[in-house]
Swiss-Prot record:
Subcellular localization, as worded in the UniProt entry: Endoplasmic reticulum membrane; Microsome membrane
Binding site for substrate: N202
Full protein name: Steroid 17-alpha-hydroxylase/17,20 lyase
Gene name of the encoded protein: CYP17A1
Coiled coil (UniProt feature): none
Single annotated GO MF: steroid 17-alpha-monooxygenase activity
Function (record text): A cytochrome P450 monooxygenase involved in corticoid and androgen biosynthesis. Catalyzes 17-alpha hydroxylation of C21 steroids, which is common for both pathways. A second oxidative step, required only for androgen synthesis, involves an acyl-carbon cleavage. The 17-alpha hydroxy intermediates, as part of adrenal glucocorticoids biosynthesis pathway, are precursors of cortisol.
InterPro entries in alphabetical order: Cyt_P450, Cyt_P450_CS, Cyt_P450_E_grp-I, Cyt_P450_sf
Biological or metabolic pathway of the protein: Steroid hormone biosynthesis; Steroid biosynthesis; glucocorticoid biosynthesis
Reported regulation of activity: Regulated predominantly by intracellular cAMP levels. The 17,20-lyase activity is stimulated by cytochrome b5, which acts as an allosteric effector increasing the Vmax of the lyase activity.
E.C. code: 1.14.14.19, 1.14.14.32
């Protein structure tokens, strides 16, 4: 009996023990690992994973490996090595791991965010970037779209003058409408039932993906009942059903001579491919309805929750740092005043605000470990070999909290991004990659930066953002899911007296 058990264990150890492709090569240091479960028993069980990986650097160095179940994962925690992965060898490491939950979210690895490297991903990323080029000038200028939604947001917040509210949903609505206009020229009115559907499925997906899922480490577990997986499937289906409805309705309106949004760009590419008018890289199979909807879903999902979350982080840090908030009010009053609304051109004048946004993106990065990469070929990082198929995680948290790169990295200090006189923005460290870099960098970076600047400039021009009367400050601990979320909090909204007086004077 025991002989059979021993034989079984030896067989499993042989099958699942990591095998080196290049026996003589030098590999990164590795945590202890066991057959089947890998390094899981030896990883810290409490605290945020990004911070735990950061702490492990003290023992294993800025690059090391762990066995996540049966897969080898290399953790990179230094900016030079990170840029080697993302930029210098970006093509080598531009793959995406196959993960059960993300396969569900991406309709079996379609779209952009979670699709593996290949012709499909390259095509859809190129088409998505072409879409953003549509919004550079004229009536469709990105700034104009953002400002019209922020104006509606501010009007709504003004109805809560003197009240203590959670700004999450109002900000979500504004940013959802910006993305919706970019994707398919739709802007939702407050109270629209479709808007509630978007909000609910978005929260459901993020909540499902945020739970530690053994099925991602051990895919064979998906044959067993799994409430989290079922919840994810349910919300993804809701998303897909809504996008399909919008897509089918839009097909009747599509005009190839009027390309104004992302759905137009994708549909035109599909039409050209079907008619044989496209290049060899534009296979019609890569532009099926399912492919198109998944790409729209990616842009919609990634563009909404990330920016909404960062706006809330900025407000939270300002509530904790009233001296910074006071300086921001002074900066806006002196450089913009109240006779006009802020514009993107004000970024050259509102330097402290821009520095504040950069500091929040440093101290609370949207994705503390980015989205995992995968080695497409046998390659290397620094002096270490990395085998094809190895998963690679860039620990952005480590880059942004390295004491050798940042003075007091755990302290909120927007002034670190300004010269001593406060008259010029600077880059205090190369260890700063809030939007990633290279082939897999965030394609919505320009949009996100404009949204963050304009939303905060408009809010600070019009409203006093105050700690509630009960003195309850937001928690800055955070909740790392797909996006590094901040726990719900409330802020007291008061229309600024100077703004009210300026509006009254302007109307007379």
């Amino acid at each position: 009996m025991w002989e059979l058990v021993a034989l079984l264990l030896l067989t499993l150890a042989y099958l699942f023990w990591p095998k080196r492709r290049c026996p003589g090569a030098k590999y990164p240091k590795s945590l202890l690992s066991l057959p089947l479960v890998g390094s899981l028993p030896f990883l810290p069980r409490h605290g945020h994973m990004h911070n735990n990986f950061f702490k492990l650097q003290k023992k294993y160095g800025p690059i090391y490996s762990v066995r996540m179940g049966t897969k080898t994962t290399v953790i990179v925690g230094h900016h030079q090595l990170a840029k080697e992965v993302l930029i210098k060898k970006g093509k080598d490491f531009s793959g995406r791991p196959q993960v059960t939950t993300l396969d569900i979210l991406s309709n079996n690895r379609k779209g952009i965010a979670f699709a593996d490297y290949g012709a499909h991903w390259q095509l859809h990323r190129r088409l998505a970037m072409a879409t953003f080029a549509l919004f550079k000038d004229g009536d469709q200028k990105l700034e104009k779209i953002i400002c019209q939604e922020i104006s509606t947001l501010c009007d709504m917040l003004a109805t809560h003058n003197g009240q203590t509210i959670d700004i999450s949903f109002p900000v979500f609505v504004a940013i959802t409408n910006v993305i919706s206009l970019i994707c398919f020229n739709i802007s939702y009115k407050n109270g629209d039932p479709e808007l509630k559907i978007v909000h609910n499925y978005n929260e459901g997906i993020i909540d499902s993906l945020g739970k530690e899922s053994l099925v991602d480490l051990f895919p064979w577990l998906k044959v067993f009942p799994n409430k989290t997986l079922e919840k994810l499937k349910r919300h993804v289906k809701t998303r897909n059903d809504l996008l399909t409805k919008i897509f089918e309705n839009y097909k009747e309106k599509f005009r190839s001579d009027s390309i104004t949004n992302m759905l137009d760009v994708l549909m035109q590419a599909k039409m050209n491919s079907d008619n044989g008018n496209a290049g060899p890289d534009q296979d019609s199979e890569l532009l099926s309805d399912n492919h198109i909807l998944t790409t729209i879903g990616d842009i919609f999902g990634a563009g909404v929750e990330t920016t909404t979350s960062v706006v809330k982080w900025i407000v939270a840090f300002l509530l904790h740092n009233p001296q910074v908030k006071k300086k921001l009010y002074e900066e806006i009053d002196q450089n913009v005043g109240f006779s006009r609304t802020p514009t993107i051109s004000d970024r050259n004048r509102l330097l402290l605000l821009e520095a504040t946004i950069r500091e929040v993106l440093r101290i609370r990065p949207v994705a503390p470990m980015l989205i995992p990469h995968k080695a497409n070929v046998d390659s290397s990082i620094g002096e270490f070999a990395v085998d094809k198929g190895t998963h690679v995680i860039i620990n952005l948290w480590a880059l942004h909290h390295n004491e050798k790169e940042w003075h007091q990295p755990d302290q909120f200090m927007p002034e670190r991004f300004l010269n001593p006189a406060g008259t010029q923005l600077i880059s205090p460290s190369l260890s700063y990659l809030p939007f990633g870099a290279g082939p897999r960098s965030c394609i919505g970076e320009i949009l996100a930066r404009q949204e963050l600047f304009l939303i905060m400039a408009w809010l600070l021009q019009r409203f006093d953002l105050e700690v509630p009367d009960d003195g309850q400050l937001p928690s800055l601990e955070g909740n790392p899911k797909v996006v590094f979320l901040i726990d719900s909090f409330k802020v007291k909204i008061k229309v600024r007296q100077a703004w009210r007086e300026a509006q009254a004077e302007g109307s007379t």
